[in-house]
Swiss-Prot record:
Residue stretches in coiled coil: none
Keywords for this protein: Endoplasmic reticulum, Heme, Iron, Membrane, Metal-binding, Microsome, Monooxygenase, Oxidoreductase
GO molecular function: heme binding; iron ion binding; monooxygenase activity; oxidoreductase activity, acting on paired donors, with incorporation or reduction of molecular oxygen
Membrane topology: Peripheral membrane protein
Pfam families the record matches: p450
The protein, known as: Cytochrome P450 4e3
Annotated source species: Drosophila melanogaster (Fruit fly)
UniProt cofactor(s): heme
Length: 526
């Protein structure tokens, strides 16, 4: 009896001593990195924040405190480095070995499997090479037709929602637009999310994205084993099955249609249409001389839908929100639209006209500087690495802070001023500005994303004057209304004057505003 009690007391102590010794060895290797002092067992978990919004704010504070450079923090005995030094970012992103994603991406495996986002090693290399032609110019033109069609529907939805000077949450509306675009381009199947927001598949997408964000920063639910014991697990399983059944069903129907000369396509409206979809390119692709398996096709289609939906929602939403706060910028954009589009401002914009919109391009670059759709990229060190002379031990997670780069005054003059012209006057050096990452694991769909962003914003600017939720929120001096990256005294001053419609930025896998992005729309009269 006493031996059992003694074992219960001693075993945790031995375990604690083991982890403390391992962490002490790692701290010695990492001593050149500045950061907040960890406490036993917790590390810095007691100071980092309780939710993604608080954690993002803490990261900005620590970054400022430690010279706007890399910094080290600990969650328990797990070491994490927030990387912001362009030279070291260049090494990491160009590395052919340091390509394993951080453990936060494990939350995506039940849904996405091991597609391009979550895989590594030889599978990732082969699939990357195979998928690259899917974003060829000719295929993008087919995708652009889908973007134009859905942008027109989106304007109709916005006119109804914003009638009578109503304040709307633009982030909420953009979510359904981008879901329609991505499902149509990925599989050739319209799901009509803008009109049927309560459909089972639309709700499944929303619920799955919420679940991933919720679990990412929960100390216990991040574990699959622990999560399986919670009340939310059964609903999660149902959501997962809905998404899997939907995608596999479309794949099987498309295979049947191809094998039967498309004869069934004319009789089943849920089948993919004749425009080239991402699914079609996968069905005609090979790896090592063989066709892709159904599971491989499922993984890549699901990955494309996840990456192309959440990130583009963020990009479109924050871009239009910035228009509401910066009317001078909006006027310049509208003038350019008039010059390029001519008298018929209601028609669809062509591929060639998009290319002529130079100020729109500058605007999107500046919007992505201050509100990057993907604020952080995670890498896991599967062995010790020498990163430009700094030894980073095995087991360390690297958080590549793309969002912090945009607020670094050593890279961008007056970073808290929103000024698209800066990208025309002085271009940042490589790896100082990374809205779509860089290197071998850069965003494979960046041309797709930029085309959708430009198409939607062009249509919004031509259709509406975008206004802030209340007039007092107009920026009269071009300053951003964020307090992130400011000196402590200025941050306190800005926080004290926070308006209820100022966004509360939250960063998990993509950037969002926890309280929405509120604005008004006034229809333009031609």
């Amino acid at each position: 009896m006493w031996l059992a009690v003694l074992a219960l007391l001693v075993l945790p102590l031995i375990t604690l001593v083991y982890f403390e010794r391992k962490a002490s060895q790692r701290r010695q290797l990492l001593k050149e990195f500045n950061g907040p002092t960890p406490v036993p067992i917790l590390g810095n978990a007691n100071r980092i924040g309780k939710n993604p919004a608080e954690i993002l704010s803490t990261f900005f504070d620590w970054w400022y405190d430690y010279g706007k450079d890399n910094f080290l923090f600990w969650i328990g005995y797990s070491s994490h480095i927030v990387m912001t030094n362009p030279k070291q970012l260049e090494y990491i992103l160009n590395s052919q070995q340091l390509i394993q994603k951080s453990t936060i991406y494990d939350l995506l495996h039940p849904w996405l499997g091991h597609g391009l986002l979550t895989s590594f090693g030889s599978k990732w290399h082969k699939h990357r090479k195979m998928i690259t032609p899917s974003f060829h110019f000719n295929i993008l033109q087919d995708f652009h037709e889908v973007m134009n069609e859905n942008s027109a529907k989106f304007m109709t939805q916005l006119k109804k929602a914003s009638a009578g000077d109503t304040i709307i949450d633009f982030q909420e509306h953009a979510n359904y637009l981008t879901l329609d675009v991505i499902c149509d381009t990925a599989m050739g199947v319209p799901i009509n999310a803008m009109e049927q927001r309560d459909s089972s598949i639309v709700q499944a997408f929303r619920d799955m994205c919420y679940n991933i964000n919720m679990r990412a920063f929960h100390p216990f639910k991040r574990s699959n084993r622990v999560f399986s014991l919670t009340p939310e697990f059964s609903a999660y399983q149902k959501t997962l099955k809905t998404l899997q059944d939907f995608t596999y069903d479309i794949i099987e129907k498309r295979v049947y249609a191809l094998q039967n000369g498309g004869s069934k396509e004319d009789h089943d409206p849920s089948l993919p249409r004749k425009k080239m979809a991402f699914l079609d390119t996968l069905l005609s692709s090979t790896i090592d001389g063989r066709p892709l398996t159904r599971q491989e096709i499922y993984e890549e289609v699901s990955t494309f839908m996840f990456e192309g939906h959440d990130t583009t929602t963020s990009g479109v939403s924050f871009s239009v929100y910035l228009l509401s706060r910066h009317p001078d910028v909006q006027r310049k954009l509208y003038r350019e639209q008039c010059e390029v589009m001519g008298h018929d401002m209601n028609r669809s914009v062509s591929f060639q006209e998009i290319a002529k919109m130079k100020y729109l391009d500058l605007f999107i670059k500046e919007a992505q500087r201050v509100y990057p759709s993907v604020p952080f990229i995670g890498r896991y060190c599967d062995k010790d690495y020498d990163i430009n002379g700094s030894i980073v031990p095995k087991g360390t997670t690297l958080n590549l802070a793309l969002i912090l780069l945009g607020y670094n005054d050593r890279i961008f003059k007056d970073p808290h001023h929103f000024r698209p012209e800066r990208f025309e006057e002085e271009k940042p050096a490589p790896f100082e500005y990374l809205p779509f990452s860089a290197g071998p694991r850069n965003c494979i769909g960046q041309k797709f994303a930029l085309l959708e962003l430009k198409t939607v914003i062009s249509k919004v600017v031509r259709s509406f004057e975008v206004l802030p939720a209340v007039d007092e929120l107009v920026s009269t001096d071009g300053r951003l209304n964020t307090y992130l990256g400011l000196a402590p005294d200025e941050k306190l001053k800005r926080e004290a004057g926070r308006h209820k419609y100022d966004p509360i930025l939250s960063a998990v896998l993509t950037l969002k505003s926890d309280n929405g992005l509120h604005l008004r729309l006034r229809e333009r009269r031609s």
